Amino acid sequence: ATDSEQLAYLSSTVGGERIYLDRDLVEADLTITVGEIAFDPVMGIRGTNSVLYPGLSNVEAIAKAHGQGHLELGPNDERALRQMVDEIGWLLGVQFTVQVLAGEGTSASEIFAGLDTSICNAGREALFEKSMVTSPERAEIVLIAIDQDCAGHQWNQLGAALATARSLVAKGGKVIVLSELAMEPGDGINLIRESRQARDALKPLRQQSPPDLIPATQIASIVDWAEVYLLSKLDSTLVDELFMIPLESVESVDRLLRVGDSTLFIAGGQHTFGEIAPPN
């Protein structure tokens, strides 16, 4: 968020929202956005103008945009926040952008530079081609690996990978997550630990809206749907308290894979989006 004294009024959106942004941005002669094109649980697809808002606005804008995501919507479905950030980019006069598509580990798969609209379309097409996971039916077992990307291993990556698995695994099936997560849990994650059942945490998560609202919601949603086995560097007691089953070694993963009629393997799970193909 930008300090209130450094904010300047840009304009009002079609919906009547008064937009305040960093003064240097509003008064700049030329603005070039730089960011990552990626799937996003709130916006559908993050990139181009989403780097501007709400991050470079005030605390109120950030709080208003902070949500649990939309499990029922796909990345191509219309999202009010995504429409707003694109309108803000237009109001600001942004025309040129540089965007990156994540590759394996800390590498970039593709880099795009050019006019905002054309890069948005090209990046979206590349993202779907590289990172959309489509299955004809739900699998009994989903094994999903999380790479160490530029952000390291954080709860956000775990949550994103679990959201993909939630879309692809059968009810009561098994999800096996390979991660090196060792990060301390945030307030939202701790709400799950304090609950008798994972789904009991969803309402207080909405009410309190902690900084880790999204990954906490993603975790609470999947452990109520399937058995989740986690290989990580977290303490096994913490994993148990999150209603997941801790794995101590790769050998434990091998044993789990011997059971089950159908298994889906996904690499770089934090960058993906899962969907079941519509019937013909």
Locate each region found by the language model.
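Glycine-rich, anion-gripping cofactor-binding loops and their flanking helix/strand elements
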Residues: 1-27, 152-160, 202-223, 234, ...
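Conserved, well-structured core segments that form the ligand-binding/active-site neighborhood
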Residues: 1-13, 17-138
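Structural motif
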Residues: 32-34, 141-145, 176, 264-265
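Glycine/threonine-rich flexible loop motifs
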Residues: 42-49, 152-157, 274-275
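Active-site proximal loops enriched in glycine and acidic residues that flank catalytic Cys/His/Asp
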Residues: 100-102, 145-147, 159, 177-181, ...
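A general structural motif
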Residues: 116-135, 146, 150-160, 209-211
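C-terminal catalytic subdomain
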Residues: 152-229
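Extended hydrophobic packing segments that form well-structured cores
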Residues: 232-280
